[in-house]
Amino acid sequence: MLSRLPHWALLAVLCFPCLLHAESPVEPVRMGCGIMTFDTVPGWGLRPNGQSAIGPTHGSVVIDQAGNIYTSARAGVFVFSPAGKVIHSYLGGDYTNLHDMEIREEDGQEFIYGARNQDAEGIKFNAHSGEVVLRLPYPEESGLGAIQFNPTAITVAPNVDIFLSNGYASNHIFRYDQAGKYLSHFGKKGNGLKEFNTAHGMTLDTRYDPVRLLICDRNHQPKGRLLHYSLDGEFIEEVITGLGMPTAVAIQGDYVSVPDLHGRLVILDKSNTIMAVLGHNPDPAKRANFNVPQGEWIEGIFSGTHGSYWDADGNLYVQDWNVDGRIMKLVRVQ
């Protein structure tokens, strides 16, 4: 058939075959198994020109009561509609370098708590106005001396006490009251049973009564594990091991999503048994790799899975640690 084309068209086909496929749509990829089966949403979160809307990502994902999705990037916090369009952003200044976020309703308003690793503080701001209402600096009254302070994770207890993990430094977890007054700390760096080797992620484990802290011990050797601690800082148990480099935890009902920096997302049930593994990257060179440009992204394959969050329908939003900034939507298959 090529021989019947005009000479100029034949030359174009031979020299630029990619033109034939430039407009080929990307198909959804199905992943997971059983009740934890998901389809990707190609192009979700991208600009109309197909480029990333957010720039380099090393952060988190949360969702407000209206269903809007907040993700943190180097530049600031971007707010997406469920359809994947940027509807608002908080850029520069106080909103940069939010390594972890938690969103809470308090007295009829929604607030985002954030851990700013490169800026050595925790922060609380109004999710809808951006007003900063609280800062959590290193608590010198802890008596630990002049230590490095690089917070990686934050969570809030039912009584509004705040827990802030110094996961990129001393690995202490600091507890403050709702006004920001230092109360206590626990933990230390190490590979022992009750120590942390990068207490990278943390949330309240609401599957238990009373609630517990669920902590990602990302670089623990050789395990890569999750731990339970009481809200008083008492060790409870090693929850699960063998998770690679668990970066964060998000809970909906009985289920936990655990991003693994090696390029996959693990889902656990209430017994902390693995139910499904999503987005597994088969290429060792592209696992835990920040420098995978958008041109090398593969639909349904993760590279540096760093944050995740469930919406009310059980869909997942996943952020990769990535030079160009990647956030993905996974739709639960009913």
Locate each region found by the language model:
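Conserved beta-propeller blade signature
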Residues: 68-70, 111-113, 161-165, 212-214, ...
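Beta-strand-rich domains and repeat architectures in extracellular enzymes and scaffolds
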Residues: 42-75, 325
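Short loop/turn segments immediately following the C-termini of beta-strands
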Residues: 74, 117, 167-169, 207, ...
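Surface-exposed loop and turn segments in beta-propeller and other repeat-based domains
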Residues: 42-51, 91-94, 133-145, 181-194, ...
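Blade/loop signatures of beta-propeller domains
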Residues: 23-43
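Blade-loop segments of beta-propeller domains
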Residues: 48, 74-111, 116-117, 140-142
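Blade-level signature of beta-propeller repeat domains, shared across WD40, Kelch, NHL, RCC1
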Residues: 303-334
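Beta-rich, blade/repeat-based domains predominating
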Residues: 50-66, 94-108, 141-161, 191-212, ...
